[in-house]
């Protein structure tokens, strides 16, 4: 008689071994997933609030929404602009009084704009964009406004020194300067064009007119490569990001296609890696060499507004606002946020239709400490400090 149990014993052993291997693989996969989950290596705290009133619980100033925040090249001066038709200039140390001092990390300094800012310059229209001009020693600031005008201001004399109206009165969403050739600037507008201009020539023809995608979809953001070189990146309402060599702008050198809605911001993380934001509610990390998406970042709410985007290159962190009135920080390595801060201001009746975080900017210094400044639709500035966990 054949021994059936003996006959099938090896097969049974094979199944047991296979089952053990599957369990081992499942455990390893779970461990890998655990390792890939976002972890926060930073301790963040809110240190300062600068509001339009003397009390952070006072009624928000609806007409004082902050659309843009920019540190100068020394990271010691902050400029802000927005609906109030003012460029406000702040000394960073006056806002961040706790730097390099021992303090209660839960203590928050409350200031108001009137006393906190060094001075302000009134502008003829609402501002959508401001940018410090390279190699100007912090004396010149460029702006783009709702009336379609690009201007430069001499901050020492506090007067406009340059003006161009390239966009036929259509709103300018974004301005930037070339770091490769600082006399060149660019502006993107609702008219569907990016204009490249020479700041030495106030009148006459611009250097180039670029119509990304060949359509008339709004150009919402422009950024020159801050590491030098002739590349400028352009984000558009056609859901794409285009890269152009300013020496030959007939065709783009790269096209980044992956967002589902309008691209609102584009930032260089390094020479070839870019981060984009869109009202499809996500950020994307791109390799411009092959036009591939490296990673998508989700968690914040963004389906209609400009909420700001800033990258801290030393630490690999991304900051953005949100339509639910929160500040979000992502690590470039993970697709979910590593830190979220909710404002004290109430949101609207629909949960996100009232106040929202409308602008953010990292201070580009150090590696074990970081500073993020956020502006709101209520006109508040918030200063956050982060320290790397030991």
Regions found by a protein language model. Give the residues of each.
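Intrinsically disordered terminal extensions that flank WD40 beta-propeller domains
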Residues: 1-64, 72, 93, 387
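A structural motif specific to WD40 beta-propellers
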Residues: 47, 98-100, 116-118, 138, ...
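WD40/WD-repeat beta-propeller blade N-cap
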Residues: 52-65, 120-127, 165-172, 210-219, ...
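Loop/turn segments within WD40 beta-propeller blades
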Residues: 70-75, 130-138, 175-183, 222-229, ...
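Conserved strand-to-loop turn within each blade of WD40 beta-propeller repeats
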Residues: 81-84, 143-147, 187-191, 199, ...
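WD40-repeat beta-propellers
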Residues: 87-93, 144, 150-154, 175, ...
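Blade-loop segments of beta-propeller domains
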Residues: 101-132
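Blade-level signature of beta-propeller repeat domains, shared across WD40, Kelch, NHL, RCC1
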Residues: 358-390
């Amino acid at each position: 008689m054949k021994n059936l149990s003996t006959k099938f014993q090896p097969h049974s052993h094979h199944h047991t071994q296979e089952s053990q291997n599957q369990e081992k693989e499942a455990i390893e996969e779970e461990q890998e997933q655990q390792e890939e989950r976002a972890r926060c290596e930073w301790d963040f705290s809110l240190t300062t609030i600068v509001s339009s009133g003397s009390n952070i619980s006072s009624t928000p100033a609806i007409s004082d929404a902050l659309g843009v925040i920019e540190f100068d090249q020394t990271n010691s001066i902050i400029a802000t602009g927005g609906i109030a038709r003012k460029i406000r200039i702040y000394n960073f140390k006056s806002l961040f009084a706790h730097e390099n001092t021992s303090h209660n990390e839960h203590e928050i300094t409350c200031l108001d704009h009137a006393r906190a800012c060094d001075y302000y310059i009134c502008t003829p229209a609402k501002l959508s964009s401001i940018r410090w001009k390279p190699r100007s020693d912090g004396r010149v600031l460029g702006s783009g406004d709702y009336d379609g005008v690009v201007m430069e201001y001499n901050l020492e004399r506090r007067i406009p020194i340059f003006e161009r109206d390239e966009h036929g009165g259509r709103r300018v969403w974004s301005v930037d300067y070339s770091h490769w050739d600082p006399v060149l600037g660019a502006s993107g507008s609702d008219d569907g064009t990016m204009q490249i201009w020479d700041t030495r020539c106030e009148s006459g023809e611009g250097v180039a007119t670029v119509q990304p995608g060949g359509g008339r979809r709004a150009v919402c953001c422009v950024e020159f490569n801050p590491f030098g070189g002739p590349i400028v990146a352009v984000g558009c309402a056609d859901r794409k990001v285009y890269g152009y060599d300013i020496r030959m702008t007939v065709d783009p050198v790269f096209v980044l296609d992956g967002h589902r809605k309008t691209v609102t911001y584009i930032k260089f993380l390094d020479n070839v890696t870019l981060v984009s934001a869109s009202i499809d509610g996500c950020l994307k990390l791109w390799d411009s060499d092959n036009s591939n998406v490296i990673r998508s970042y989700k968690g914040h709410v963004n389906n209609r507004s400009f909420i700001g985007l800033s990258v801290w290159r030393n630490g690999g962190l991304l900051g953005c606002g949100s339509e639910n009135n929160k500040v979000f920080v992502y690590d470039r390595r993970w697709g979910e946020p590593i830190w979220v801060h909710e404002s004290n201001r109430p949101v609207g009746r629909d949960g996100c239709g009232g106040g929202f975080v409308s602008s953010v900017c990292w201070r580009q210094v150090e590696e074990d400490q970081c500073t993020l400044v956020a502006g709101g639709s209520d006109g508040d500035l918030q200063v956050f400090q982060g320290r790397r966990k030991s």
